[in-house]
Amino acid sequence: MRELVEIMAKALVDNPDQLEVREIAGSDTLVIELRPAKEDIGKIIGKKGRNVQAMRTLLNAAAAKLRKRVVLEIIDQ
């Protein structure tokens, strides 16, 4: 899942080298923390949150196969 988020996020941002992705695994839940550069947060979120919502939808579809729940958090540095 971490790789999927990383690929999607790097395609959206101007500074892919400053992008950090962290995965925190629980028993049924997987939390993925995404830390973009300050100037790239708007690009990750997108207009009216469309980009981040699309990323969450894809993650939930992939997680359903694994019978897990995924939470994508965008963290402002």
Locate the predicted segments by residue.
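RNA-contacting regions in translation and RNA-metabolism proteins
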Residues: 1-43, 51-77
